[in-house]
Amino acid sequence: MDHPEDESHSEKQDDEEALARLEEIKKSIEAKLTLRQNNLNPERPDSAYLRTLDSSIKRNTAVIKKLKQINEEQREGLMDDLRGVNLSKFVSEAVTAICEAKLKSSDIQAAVQICSLLHQRYKEFSASLTQGLLKVFFPGKSAEDLEADKNSKAMKKRSTLKLLLELYYVGVIEDSNIFINIIKDLTSVEQLKDRDTTQTNLTLLTSFARQGRIFLGLPISGQDEDFFKGLDVTADQKKSFKKAFNTYYDALADLLQSEHKLLLQMEKENAKLVNAKGELSEDSASSYEKLRKSYDHLYRNISSLAEALDMQPPVMPEDGTTRLTAGDEASPSGTVKDTSVPEPIWDDEDTKTFYECLPDLRAFVPAVLLGEAEPKSNEQSAKAKEKLSESSSEVVENQQTTEDTTEVSADSASMDDRSNAEQPKEKEEVEKEKAKDTKKEKGKEKDSEKKMEHEKEKGKSLDVANFERLLQRLPGCVSRDLIDQLTVEYCYLNSKTNRKKLVKALFNVPRTSLELLAYYSRMVATLASCMKDIPSMLVQMLEDEFNSLVHKKDQMNIETKIRNIRFIGELCKFKIVPAGLVFSCLKACLDEFTHHNIDVACNLLETCGRFLYRSPETTLRMTNMLDILMRLKNVKNLDPRQSTLVENAYYLCKPPERSARISKVRPPLHQYVRKLLFSDLDKDSIANVLKQLRKLPWSECEQYILKCFMKVHKGKYGQIHLIASLTSGLSRHHDEFVVAVVDEVLEEIRVGLELNEYGAQQKRLAHMRFLGELYNYEHVDSSVIFETLYLTLLYGHDTSEQEVLDPPEDFFRVRMVIILLETCGHYFDRGSSKKRLDQFLIHFQRYILSKGHLPLDIEFDLQDLFANLRPNMTRYSTIDEVNAAILQLEEREHASSGDKVSIERHSDTKPSNKSSSDVISSNGKSTAKDIRENGEAHGEESDSDSGSGSVVRDGQNEELDDGNHERGSESGDGDDYDDGDGPGSDDDKFRVRQKVVTVDLEEQADFDQELKALLQESMEQRKLELRGRPALNMTIPMSVFEGSGKDHHHFGRVVGENGEEVLDEENGEQREVQVKVLVKRGNKQQTRQMLIPSDCALVQSTKQKEAAELEEKQDIKRLVLEYNERDEEEANGLGTQILNWTSGGSRGSTRTGEGSGKSGGSRHRFYYHQGGGGSYHARRK
């Protein structure tokens, strides 16, 4: 439990830190106000003052070049340079340089300071700068602009917009109408047609909305409100800005809706293709992934803009195809199998309805169109034929009678003609009219018969086309409603020929479309009630195919065999295939239980084995078959795959008896911890959760809290950083807990690599993300991250288990690396960590290329990763290119390490020691004793005029060597180099490592001779040089330095050639300064001492110059030491990795200790953000 005193102390400390931050914010606002006031009312120097400054072209050109590389580190130096030059004639060049500068977000304030300085000095600078910056948003359509990199142009626009806003806030730019033109161009609806331009404009508008809330009339909270009150933004301008943003946001919402509809349509089409063909083509999958990625990116950007505008993000209607839903967890309470109660045949009501509730065709189709109505129609046609024959015989009789009557009438007529000669003409006319009428009737009958035949032919062709279309729709019927509708439609096209075609189409189902077998079987079962020949023909064809496949005994056509046996099983569940046929097929497979027969038997049992086992009439026989199956499995020496198949089929038919599932009972304290971490934790409640965790009895709950922290995969993926923040918060009070968390995370990552289980992939990704967040909160070092990255790539390789641990087709390790680098890789942008990340990314590319073809999602993630971390890095396309790059990298490292080794060897040899001692003695009167005395001072100023700088450096190095080898400074001049195991042991060490290299003796001798000559020449030259002397503008005779210290005791403080103040020893008052004047008499040069007043301009300028040089040296020395300490912290893991060096072990340990001591504050310094609910820990800055 925490003591109240500790809590009060921590709360007091938090309050003090909050007050300090508020004070810093207040000072920053006051500085901005002062700068704004100076820019609005600039006091520009006159032309006379500007003429006194440096106006040379060379100096101005150098300063303008520096303006192209503005950053925070060079700000002060650049401003000093600008104050010392006259840029009146180079204002346009300075503006161009500033506009071309590649500014980062951290460099914006430095650019504002520099622009303010130029604005306060040159009147025309502000207008020229405004025009130059606006050209970034409204460029001319030249070829270079069109071919420029879109990514770099977007980044340039973003930084320029931020710079314009900041310049407006500080008064360099006073016209706010320029932002109206920019916003109108960005919110143009015409640009929505281009996807890339829309994404770029969205990011720019979001940045403007966040930084320029005053333009949109949005509320401003905090102390910034006083600063923004002074800005002159009219109500009309705010209205114009707000209208442009709202109009553009509405257009974006419509665009997002259309994108969503298009995505849904494509998903539905893909679903149809998958159902019809079983897979998607590469083009379809690629286009879908591209559209999906574009939609997600657009949605994220629109949500960010809505958040910046204080609006609700658009809500898309959810659809089953666009969201992933997790199934409900299994019921915690199970039931024990009771053999006394008969088990249901079907597992659920839907399955029972599918197999038992078939549609009644007589209720949807007229009986005439069904097969059972054919006999009646045949009888009717027979009767009609009889009637037609009877009527035809009657017509023949009538014709005969008419002929007889005509003959009789003709005879009588001839007699009448003879008797009555007056009437022949009238009878002839009547007979002609009758003949014409009969001819007309016969012609009409022929025409009607032709029309009937033509209509019948048209009807037949139309029926054939409709039936072909129906068969084409058959593979797409993947639901109960679709297959039932198709069955009804077929009844309208029923005929004997069509029934044969239908059976053939059902039999030739694609062997890879096994999901269609159940629906085809339902269609057959539905038609079997009216068309008895369809099921009989299909069953006969399936049985013949099974017999032919079994009797061939070849190991071919496994897919055809599985399709055949599963079709038989599905028809068995519809009771179309008798159970005896199924048992005979199963017995045929069990009689020869090898190879494909095992797969066929298992597929048959998986299809209808459970149905037969639970049916009362077949349960006994099925039980016997299952027992035979298990006995054969135990007797046969089956491979693991076949053994698993048999067990799955057996337990699917006859599940084992299991006890009831017992739900886990947790103590209330554990339930409360889980509620805090998995239910209550979010960004608003993190402070309260941290407070509640600290209130818990830590001795009882520590292990369980650690266990829950390790279950980050059971929570939301987006809340992993909150768990890391809680870890950071708890570290202030429980240091050992953080160590345990880091150890557990690293152990879990390694265990995941060792097991490589598919079911643990979500857990492994969550742990990689957690490790990255722990680095962000400064709980692990970069060395841990890089060790984990290399472990992920290399673990298990070059071993016998490589195919199991990291198969060639498995890309999960690539995803793990992507997750870790996406989480914390953006912090590796400087120092040694940047170099190490560059090296790792090259090795990472080799690992990727060794895998083969990448899936689309992995490729897209890799593109995003390299774009975010190293956009300019080369992506290699072949393994040879990346191997060449790695070889070149290793050669560079080997060359650099070889240079270091040679430098250490030559610096530790005796000739170099001798030459250094000669140089010291030649420069002045310093000896080895003086070196030791000065070396112990660690940088104190020497009273000697000669060689002070070199003596101090050598003394520092000597002290480090003394500390490393545990020796004092009592030894003589050469003891520091000859005693101990210093350089000699290093040299021996390198020789041992190089024994494997075979060197030609003649070449080695030539090399040693040339090296010796080179060193001798270098030493001869160094003897004549003056070391540690201040550089003068003239050559000074050696006689000057020989007697430079004669009168040291007469004055309190004496200076050589530069001159220093001379103090009287008695009263210590400042008198005069002693200098030496070089004169020439004849051919001889002599020096004479001269006293000049201390307030003279020469003395004052000399003193200022020396003081500035000394301060610069101290700053450079401090910066170099700090950089070395930070570099060693990153490389050595904060002092936890002790390097066992033989010659410099103590030095490494000493510096590591210092680095860790200094970095301890930075590593365990946590930042707090004040919120409504308290404070929580933020990530590294």
Curated annotation (Swiss-Prot):
Residue span(s) of domain MIF4G: 61-264, 469-655, 672-871
Chain intervals for the UniProt region annotation (Disordered): 309-348, 375-459, 893-991, 1129-1181
Chain coiled-coil ranges: 6-41, 260-309, 425-451, 539-559, 1000-1021
Residue span of region Necessary for interaction with UPF1: 999-1102
Region (Binds to UPF3): 735-755
Residues covered by region (Interaction with UPF1): 999-1023, 1066-1111
Pfam families assigned to the protein according to its UniProt record, in alphabetical order: MIF4G (PF02854), Upf2 (PF04050)
Positions with biased composition (Low complexity): 912-926, 1142-1153
GO biological process, one term: nuclear-transcribed mRNA catabolic process, nonsense-mediated decay
Keyword Protein biosynthesis on entry: no
Gene inactivation effect: Seedling lethal. Accumulation of mRNAs with premature termination codons (PTC). Photoperiod-dependent altered development and stress responses; in long days (16 hours light), altered organ morphologies (e.g. epinastic leaves, small rosette size, long seeds, some abnormal flowers and stunted stem growth), disturbed homeostasis of wounding-induced jasmonic acid and pathogen-elicited salicylic acid. Increased resistance to Pseudomonas syringae pv. tomato strain DC3000.
Biased composition (Basic and acidic residues): 375-389, 415-459, 893-911, 927-941
One GO cellular component term: cytoplasm
Keywords: Coiled coil, Cytoplasm, Nonsense-mediated mRNA decay, Nucleus, Plant defense, Repeat, RNA-binding
InterPro entries in alphabetical order: ARM-type_fold, MIF4G-like_typ-3, Nmd2/UPF2, Upf2/Nmd2_C
Biased segments, Polar residues type: 398-412
Start and end residues of each stretch annotated as Sufficient for interaction with UPF1 C-terminus: 981-1181
Role of this protein: Recruited by UPF3 associated with the EJC core at the cytoplasmic side of the nuclear envelope and the subsequent formation of an UPF1-UPF2-UPF3 surveillance complex (including UPF1 bound to release factors at the stalled ribosome) is believed to activate NMD. In cooperation with UPF3 stimulates both ATPase and RNA helicase activities of UPF1. Binds spliced mRNA. Involved in nonsense-mediated decay (NMD) of mRNAs containing premature stop codons by associating with the nuclear exon junction complex (EJC).
Family note: Belongs to the RENT2 family.
Protein name: Regulator of nonsense transcripts UPF2
Organism this protein belongs to: Arabidopsis thaliana (Mouse-ear cress)
Lineage of producing organism: Eukaryota, Viridiplantae, Streptophyta, Embryophyta, Tracheophyta
